[in-house]
Amino acid sequence: MTTVTSAWQQAAFDLPTIDASATVQFNGFNASLGKLIGVTVKFIMDETLTDTIYNFNTHAVTVGNPRPVFATSTITATGPLGLSTVNQLTTTPQFAGVVPAAPSLGSFGSKSISNTVTGIQSGPVTVNGTPASLAAYIGGQNSVTINVDGEGSQSGSLPPNVMNGYSASANGMVYLQYIYQVPEPASMALFALGLLALTQLRRRKSS
């Protein structure tokens, strides 16, 4: 038997907020190609953390004195087959400066600082088995879910009527491929010869 690896299938996901999940779909393995013996999954993602300072005063204010304003968050992403990444982001540069005034009472001026980390990868991870144990991957559509969670905090010196809050987002690509076996050409030729010989033998017996 010859072992063959399929081309990677890929599907994108985009989470505008964390503490969320995304499910993507892949084509199931075509059993006519051979005997499925393994499935490999990986994902690559970008994460963005944003700290926004809100000024509810109708005049501009200075923040970050004596402690600059920033947010930090630990973002965990998990997927099937034990895929996992843990990444800590801090908004950079830490901010000390002027935040615009609220244009009117009941509204606010704002200033945002962001940090993006790209190319965070988990895997590839392979699960090996037999067509029976990997039956869920054969035919139809296969679902892969990526879960993203974050825990964070904010810090810095803020004057009265000013507050800050952080948010995060994540996007990326999930990849899946199949590992399967096909008969070697020589084996297929012998099998074909065997069928031919069996057919001829049956013809002789019937004549």
Q: Where would I find each of the regions flagged by the language model?
A:
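N-terminal segment immediately downstream of the Sec signal-peptide cleavage site
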Residues: M1-A60, A168-V174, Y178-Q181
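Solvent-exposed loop and beta-edge segments used for protein-protein assembly and interaction
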Residues: T5, A31-I37, V63-V69, S107-I113, ...
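Beta-strand elements of well-folded, non-transmembrane domains
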Residues: N30, F43-N55, V69-L81, Q121, ...
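Beta-sandwich strand segments
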Residues: V61-T62, G82-V86, Q154-S169
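Beta-strand-rich interaction/scaffold domains
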Residues: G64-P124
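Cysteine-clustered segments with highest specificity for TGF-beta superfamily mature ligands
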Residues: A102-V162
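A short, hydrophobic C-terminal helix/tail in secreted or cell-surface proteins
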Residues: E184-L201
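Short, charged juxtamembrane terminal tails flanking transmembrane helices
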Residues: R204-S207
